[in-house]
Amino acid sequence: HGTAVVVTFDPHPVQILRPGSAPKLLCGPRHQQSVLKQIGIRCLLACPFTPETARTPARDFIQQLVRAAKPLGCISVGYTWSFGHRREGDIHLLMELGQQHDFAVYGVPPLRIHGEIASSTLIREAVSKGDLARAALFLGREYSVFGSVVEGQHLGRQLGFPTANVAVENEQLPPLGVYAVHARAYDDWLPAVANLGRRPTVA
């Protein structure tokens, strides 16, 4: 028994190591917290990723994690997961360190759906093409965007129904267009229409 914690890096390591080829994020930090909460995980640890972090040897990284997370019961990672300077650590080294520091290691096999391995790359590609049904299949949930309402032109007062301008956290978005959506505000879900793109013309 224990508390499940999802550990991630912020910013994405590729943004530090190869800024020009960094992937577009499917979820920002607050969006991640919201999605994890829906599946019962209430703890998200976003570790700062810096050039110094990238130079940390694999063994040192795990030792730092063990010291910071006592008592550490287990670590679950994908079989192809790597860590440490120049990706020198893999699941086999992690298992060795688990024996030394008394924590279990679980290797999670790839998830295959219709013969394809689910991955963030595949999901980003589906979203970029507007194939949100395919994105939802591999996400295990409906594709969603998350953001904060920002000041607009108050067009809702002219149209006779409420509108909201949302500054979204997502970096990977579907093509520009008008979408039928469900909008969540606090605990209420409402049917809505979303315009993704430039400021619409209202006649």
Q: Predicted regions: what is each one?
A:
Residues 17, 149, 166:
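Short clusters of hydrophobic/aromatic residues that line enzyme substrate/ligand-binding pockets
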Residues 2-5, 30-35, 137-140, 148-149, ...:
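Short low-complexity stretches enriched in small and charged residues
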Residues 2, 41, 103, 141, ...:
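Short glycine/serine/threonine/alanine-rich loop segments
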Residues 49, 110, 168:
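Active-site donor-binding loop signature of nucleotide-sugar glycosyltransferases
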Residues 1, 152-203:
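Phosphate/ribose-recognition catalytic cores of enzymes acting on nucleotide-derived substrates
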Residues 5-8, 35-40, 68, 140-144, ...:
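A broad, low-specificity signal for short, low-complexity segments enriched in glycine/proline
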Residues 2-70:
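Core alpha/beta nucleotide-donor-binding catalytic domains of modification enzymes
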Residues 52-162, 186:
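Classical nucleotidyltransferase
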